[in-house]
UniProtKB/Swiss-Prot annotation:
Similarity comment: family membership: Belongs to the universal ribosomal protein uL5 family.
Entry keyword set: Cytoplasm, Nucleus, Ribonucleoprotein, Ribosomal protein, RNA-binding, rRNA-binding
Protein name: Large ribosomal subunit protein uL5
Organism from which the protein derives: Dictyostelium discoideum
GO cellular component: cytosolic large ribosomal subunit; extracellular matrix; nucleus; phagocytic vesicle
Region span, Disordered: 1-30
Any single biological process term in GO: translation
Function of the molecule: Component of the ribosome, a large ribonucleoprotein complex responsible for the synthesis of proteins in the cell. The small ribosomal subunit (SSU) binds messenger RNAs (mRNAs) and translates the encoded message by selecting cognate aminoacyl-transfer RNA (tRNA) molecules. The large subunit (LSU) contains the ribosomal catalytic site termed the peptidyl transferase center (PTC), which catalyzes the formation of peptide bonds, thereby polymerizing the amino acids delivered by tRNAs into a polypeptide chain.
InterPro entries, per database record: Ribosomal_uL5, Ribosomal_uL5_C, Ribosomal_uL5_CS, Ribosomal_uL5_dom_sf, Ribosomal_uL5_N
Amino acid sequence: MSAKAATKNATKVAVKAPEATTPVETKKSKKDNVMRGLRIEKLVLNICVGESGDRLVRAAKVLEQLTGQTPVYSKARYTVRSFNIRRNEQIAAHVTVRGEKAAEILEKGLKVREFELRARNFSTQGSFGFGIQEHIDLGIKYDPSIGIYGMDFFVVLSRPGFRVAHKKRAGAKVGFQHKIGKEDAVNWFKTTYDGIVIGGKK
C-alpha cells in the first residue's frame, strides 16, 4: 500500500459520524438559548373611575406619583346610560412604563398580591394582568386630598428579536416557535418571582 493510500484510510478512520441529538438535549438547548429568554416589554397601569372630572384628575396624580410619568386619559367607547357614561367621555387614566422602573413597580404590585395569581390572569399570548384595591399598598404615602384608588396592572412579555415585527421598513413576522404562550408566561412568573399560580392546569 502506498503512503498516500495509507494516509487516506487513516483520515477515514479518524472521522466520526455525527452523534444523534436526543429530544431531552434539544429541549435543554432551547431552554439555555439566550434568544428564548423572556423579559418585560412594558407595564401598563390603569385606573378607571367611570367618570370625568375631579376624581379622574386625582387618579392621574396617583399614577404620576408612582411612575414619574404623565398619564394619558382614556375615553369611553360607548354610551352606558345606566352608569351615566357618555361616548368619548374621559373615564380612565393609564400610563406605560418600561425598563427597570417597570420591573420595580411590577414587583411592588405582586408583593401586594403575595406573589399569587390565578391561571386565568394569563392570556394565551403570554401576557398577564391583575389588580390591587389600594394604591397606598405600593408604598405611596396617603394623601387625604387625593383619596385611595385601586389600579390594574397589565404586563406584556417579549423575547429578543420581537422588534422585527414592529419595524416599518424590512419588517418580518415572529416565528411560531419563538412566540410566547401561556405556559411560557406562567413558568417565567414562577421562576422569576417564586410565584404561585392557582387554578387551571398551570
